[in-house]
Structures are given as structure tokens and as C-alpha cells.
UniProtKB/Swiss-Prot annotation:
The gene is HBB. Pfam families: Globin (PF00042). The keyword Disulfide bond does not apply. The modification S-nitrosocysteine is found at residue 94. This is Hemoglobin subunit beta. Heme b binds at residues 64, 93. Involved in oxygen transport from the lung to the various peripheral tissues. Belongs to the globin family.
Amino acid sequence: MVHLTAEEKAAVTALWGKVDVEDVGGEALGRLLVVYPWTQRFFDSFGDLSTPAAVMSNAKVKAHGKKVLNAFSDGMAHLDNLKGTFAKLSELHCDKLHVDPENFRLLGNVLVCVLAHHFGKEFTPQVQAAYQKVVAGVATALAHKYH
């Protein structure tokens, strides 16, 4: 559960309605793989990830980024039940994929950077603060199975 004021909830949902999940998702996942290259080990089947340009133009990275943000959209629709919303993904990432849960926090922070880049002045410090709460809540929900 994320504790947002009514104003924060309105701000994050209004902005999220404008997000192009394909564009933002691909950029966010791509940036994660470039900025934190050790995360690439989970994407061996994605082909060429040898340079930042290769990562950012990789069709599989873009497609998976879209998939990630579609799941994030589910969370945005259920901010009062993130643990339940992400229970199956938490189990998958813990039991089958063995993803370090710290990576969820890293991706959340990268997503905030990408949103700031895409929305510029509309992404005010207040909106950023609200999104930081949301991505922290999603990261906690995804890490739930690890505890």
C-alpha cells in the first residue's frame, strides 16, 4: 500500500494517463541496462547489448520495457493493493528468475528520471515526490516474496 494524499494520487494518475508505455518503458528498461550493466545478465536472450546504442535500439528491450510498464499500469490502477497486484510477479522474479530485489528499486528510480525527461516542467518536484512513493511501493510489493 502506498500512502498518498488525495492531491498526490490525482497528480500521479493524471500524469500516468499521458504516458506512452511503449516509449517510456523501452527507454526506462534500456537505461537500467546501460546505467547498471550487471542487470543485463537477466536478459541473455535479448541479443546485442554490447553498447549503449545497441541496448537502446534493441527491439526485445523495447518490447519487454512495454511489458514492464503495462504491469506498472496495473499497479497504478490498484495503488491501495500493490502487494496483491504484484504477488504473482514477485513469486516469478523470486522463485524462477532469481532477480535481486534491489533491481526493482533501481528500475523505479530510472523510471522517475525518464518521466522527468518526457514531461519536463509538468513533472514538478511535488509530482516527483509522489512518484517516488509509488515506485518505492511497487519495489516493496515486488520484493514481498523474498521476505
